[in-house]
Amino acid sequence: MGKTYSSPINPIPKAPKGLAIHHWLNFLQAAYRLQPGPSEFDFHQLRKFLKLAIKTPVWLNPINYSVLAGLIPKNYPGRVHEIVAILIQETPAREAPPSAPLAEDPQKPPPYPEQAQEASQCLPILHPHGAPAAHRPWQMKDLQAIKQEVSSSAPGSPQFMQTIRLAVQQFDPTAKDLHDLLQYLCSSLVASLHHQQLETLIAQAETQGITGYNPLAGPLRIQANNPNQQGLRKEYQNLWLSAFSALPGNTKDPTWAAILQGPEEPFGSFVERLNVALDNGLPEGTPKDPILRSLAYSNANKECQKLLQARGQTNSPLGEMLRACQTWTPRDKNKILMVQPKKTPPPNQPCFRCGQVGHWSRDCKQPRPPPGPCPVCQDPTHWKRDCPQLKTDTRDSEDLLLDLPCEAPNVRERKNLLRGGGLASPRTILPLIPLSQQKQPTLHIQVSFSNTPPVSVQALLDTGADITVLPACLCPPDSNLQDTTVLGAGGPSTNKFKILPCPVHIHLPFRRQPVTLTACLIDINNQWTILGRDALQQCQSSLYLADQPSKVLPVLAPKLIGLEHLPPPPEVSQFPLNPERLQALTDLVSRALEAKHIEPYQGPGNNPIFPVKKPNGKWRFIHDLRATNSVTRDLASPSPGPPDLTSLPQGLPHLRTIDLTDAFFQIPLPTIFQPYFAFTLPQPNNYGPGTRYSWRVLPQGFKNSPTLFEQQLSHILTPVRKTFPNSLIIQYMDDILLASPAPGELAALTDKVTNALTKEGLPLSPEKTQATPGPIHFLGQVISQDCITYETLPSINVKSTWSLAELQSMLGELQWVSKGTPVLRSSLHQLYLALRGHRDPRDTIKLTSIQVQALRTIQKALTLNCRSRLVNQLPILALIMLRPTGTTAVLFQTKQKWPLVWLHTPHPATSLRPWGQLLANAVIILDKYSLQHYGQVCKSFHHNISNQALTYYLHTSDQSSVAILLQHSHRFHNLGAQPSGPWRSLLQMPQIFQNIDVLRPPFTISPVVINHAPCLFSDGSASKAAFIIWDRQVIHQQVLSLPSTCSAQAGELFGLLAGLQKSQPWVALNIFLDSKFLIGHLRRMALGAFPGPSTQCELHTQLLPLLQGKTVYVHHVRSHTLLQDPISRLNEATDALMLAPLLPLDPTTLHQLTHCNPYALRNHGATASEAHAIVQACHTCKVINPQGRLPQGYIRRGHAPNDIWQGDVTHLQYKRYKYCLLVWVDTYSGAVSVSCRRKETGSDCVASLLVAISILGKPQNINTDNGAAYLSQEFQQFCNSLAIKHSTHIPYNPTSSGLVERTNGILKTLISKYLLDNHHLPLETAVSKSLWTINHLNVLPSCQKTRWQLHQAQPLPPVPEDTLPPHTSPKWYYYKIPGLTNSRWSGPVQSLKEAAGAALIPVGGSYLWIPWRLLKRGICPRPESSAAVDPKTRDHQLHG
């Protein structure tokens, strides 16, 4: 079941939110009574169920556990049923509360009578995480329930996404179900936007590849509708959910001014979101508290605003506002299960609003009339909020139209802030103050005081100033200025500013009414006029920084370059350069500066630069951008790679190429990304600081530059492609090829493309333009009238000795020309084998004779390297040649001299490669390549597999490739039906028709059990292997020891091989294995497969001779099922042969492990003498053996478990650290609970008491010392909340708690023994072993029971009141009163009671506990007839 919480040092599971601590403790105590103990999964399911149950109306105080049990769904995971059943047994039944009386006011409509709920209901419980999902279509009630849950949330909000994600997890919907759900939940506009985003995400996912997706079976949406395609359906569901987060408006978080408190959001959570948003949104140095206090009231919901208004705390400190609103929680507004109200007849009286009969006034649709005339215009027909005089005059509001979008992205990294209740801020147009990037933010305003005309002045806008600042020249002469201290950027100032406590009127250009301030600061030096945040907030204005993009080139700047997440700019130092390189670099930088490719720059970031000399003697500028590339995100390229030029139809004979000059330098770079492309030009000999520059255009060396340029060039050429549909424009990077059917159309196309490129600022290079007639060199290939060849072919020297670098370089050149080289994969495979095991470039490789022959074959094939251009009217055919070394495929067309392409595919790196799977993969690869490059699929496939082998594979195989082969079976032809063509002789090569041995099945697999054959069971591990041969009885069994370097997989193979060797006399055999790997391996071998590389190649090759010609039945057996059928029992017997028997602990081993007492050893099989001898022989017990013990004394013991506890804190030194052990012991049973802490505080004491309660139960009384932690207010409040009575020991005597002190000694002794046995034992483990020994192993000699058995026993019987206490002889003591400095002894007096640490002495008419250190034994005072006192009874001191 998992890890249980029986260990006392494990933390208590945290209570669900909204559940009282005493209720949670009841559930914990019930859970700990389960047998076996509860697991983490049980607590997880209990918390999950309680979170949902809290939201239902049956959650009352006290809880009705019987009703709560009815809410648990059938087959609910975990053991929640058992926990609630225990609580039902322990809790007495309660009477139902009386119903509420009806309303007596005749003016009010009667309330809705509550209908009795027939059956308990609860909110729907979805599948837990990890439960298997079962698909079922939506029902109307399901859609209604989902819509009700998301009715108060916006699409894309966290609440909306959480509900939708759980619904998808529960129902496992198909693509059609998700479409229906979207149409039901969202508006048509949101559904349209979601559809666009979903199509974009699906296109990106299809290009990246999806597991199980077949491009030929239709779009992903069609394939996801199949309920059996669970993997594709899961991919579609994730894309469908991701489309919500990409909706416009959901990608940007709300600013701090737009964060609203949700209708069900706690006020504290709302204030926390505001605080985070202000930390991210306010400029540095801006005071946050005034804005936070203002928004905490203005953006709160109606309930919290009413509370603050009623208490007059709308502008109070934030702490008072939090305390005022802490009584309002969303529990008051939780959703409940609605009961259908009883229909009441409509009233006979007319409605006082509309005057009509038939409805109550509360249901009237007529708007409520105003209570009186409008206080503004005295019009009785409208409310004040609708008064026309309060409408904003828009005649002079040109600035309201300046809300233009900024093209530059925001620099600040935003954090995801939760929207309160899924609400969005209202769309209100605030006054905008346009600012400039080059100048300070200023505004022309007019300032006036009482009875003074307004004065025009230019003010500086400062959102960091709490209060407005005005110069002293504007202040009236008779103003009453007061001294004040101002805290600014330069520190506190006391003599520069005065405060004016009178109203100030500020007239703003975009506001008709002036802004009135109650006070402002006066600058006595007449230097500053600052419009502070008090004025800006009152006028509800918004500062707007207009973006002024610099126009560098006609080409638009890219929107995304991969650095939008704004990582820290790289700082790579510039390395030194010699004078020649430095001079060349200076010239190159000067040219780039003149061309306006770079500009001077002062800012962070640096990447090194250096020049490289070309073969013609010129220098090339290189910027090392590897550091920037490492933090740049890859962009999805619009093209999958270079095009296959054989797709250029022969019907387009007229060609022309266009070359672009410095193409990358034509795309402007946004200024926000300049730190990532900055560099430093050093001074000679470091005579001064270097000159800083940064790129203005897209530089070469940036990894996303090719992709960005392709996007820009494709945007320019798209309109031209639509204008000339009969022509082709092939674009790859900065290379462009034009193809047209006629010369006139080619000329027109060339002019159109040239004009479009020149208009966008992309310069052309006319001297590099090529045109037909004649060959065209493009992308390293030569385009002729009917064929495609490569410009250069590798020259191969047939020799036997190669260096690693030479062989790698030659194979790389062969890889480039392999699409046109007529050679099989086997020749290339031999050369790839020669590279294995070599890593040093200086290694010398000696080729074998077979590899040298492969070189000759490739050298001859290179002379025939040529490919045909596509003929649109002819179909495309494919040839597949499967070989043990790899697959060779050819695409060709009939009646053509050369094929279209040669494709070589290596086999996967697995131990067995089924040829059926390889054939299916080749079909998919060829169809995909043909569809991608030629726009059509292959008409037929010619392969080297016989029809007999293919038919047998389709009938007997259970591989997934069978469905693919059956789907394309109508296009299969073996090599007997050869296509026509001049290169037909190639198909008749002997090596193609060579028989493949692995295609012939070496043995036969029977679909059913063979009755007359014996059964073989085998298994293996890393150290042993075993097998059993059974035929009505065990015929043979054997265990094999394996080498130390053997793996578990090899051990299983060893066991099977040994069993097959013993089974040679039988022609048929039943094989039962618990290894899925071996079962699949045998089935693949029976169908035919190519062997692959494996660490157990030798073992795999031994299987074929042992199985040759046999008929076998293979069956997979699940291990460790404990079933009683013969197959499971024989498999368990095979496993048992490799395992040693599990023996119980003997008394000696038990004592070595736990150091328990002799009585515990006697309970585990040892005699009294043996137990005594074991303890005496233990070395650890001899070294650590406590001498002496404290006297028993008298303590207050409980008469039942959990009646009275004693608690104490003892200290333990462990590895240079001092730990506190918080010990709780039950005075009745002696059961102990311990918590290990680093501190001794009130919180630690509360936590330790919670741990003890969860294990031992809740006590009625606890007794501790008078330490500060136990007397803290937090601990006292916790005890009072659980109704636990707390008392302390005797004052001034910390040793008076005898039981817990003795327990401390026993605990420390055991821990010391465990640490002596193992110095590296963790302290938590030592504490757990000690508790196990004390509570469950050690036997108390007085009752012959363990402490835990005594803790579970019945309470002691009550003592009759007439029972007299035993008579004891009186004892007399001299004493000193604790706390007094008097050194004289008082007494003697007679003690009333004695305990382990003190005695109860009558002092001055009362009784005090006096510790032993302040007591001295005395004798009875001499009576009047005194006799000689016995000298033996003289005073003496006794220490307890």
Swiss-Prot record:
Subunit field text: Interacts with human TSG101. This interaction is essential for budding and release of viral particles.
Residue span(s) of domain Reverse transcriptase: 593-783
Lineage: Viruses, Riboviria, Pararnavirae, Artverviricota, Revtraviricetes
Positions of the Peptidase A2 domain: 457-535
Feature type site, description Cleavage: L123, P124, L337, M338, L430, P431, L553, P554, I561, G562, L1145, D1146
GO biological process, alphabetically ordered: DNA integration; DNA recombination; establishment of integrated proviral latency; proteolysis; symbiont entry into host cell; symbiont-mediated suppression of host gene expression; viral genome integration into host DNA; viral translational frameshifting
Residue ranges constituting the RNase H type-1 domain according to the UniProt record: 1010-1143
Binding-site residues, Mg(2+) 3: D1208, D1265
Span(s) of short sequence motif PPXY motif: 109-112
Catalytic activity: Endonucleolytic cleavage to 5'-phosphomonoester; DNA(n) + a 2'-deoxyribonucleoside 5'-triphosphate = DNA(n+1) + diphosphate
Integrase catalytic domain residues: 1197-1366
Name listed for the protein in its UniProt record: Gag-Pro-Pol polyprotein
Note on cofactor: Binds 2 magnesium ions for reverse transcriptase polymerase activity.
Lipidation (N-myristoyl glycine): G2
Native species: Human T-cell leukemia virus 3 (strain 2026ND)
Note: The reverse transcriptase is an error-prone enzyme that lacks a proof-reading function. High mutations rate is a direct consequence of this characteristic. RT also displays frequent template switching leading to high recombination rate. Recombination mostly occurs between homologous regions of the two copackaged RNA genomes. If these two RNA molecules derive from different viral strains, reverse transcription will give rise to highly recombinated proviral DNAs.
Domain remarks: Late-budding domains (L domains) are short sequence motifs essential for viral particle release. They can occur individually or in close proximity within structural proteins. They interacts with sorting cellular proteins of the multivesicular body (MVB) pathway. Most of these proteins are class E vacuolar protein sorting factors belonging to ESCRT-I, ESCRT-II or ESCRT-III complexes.
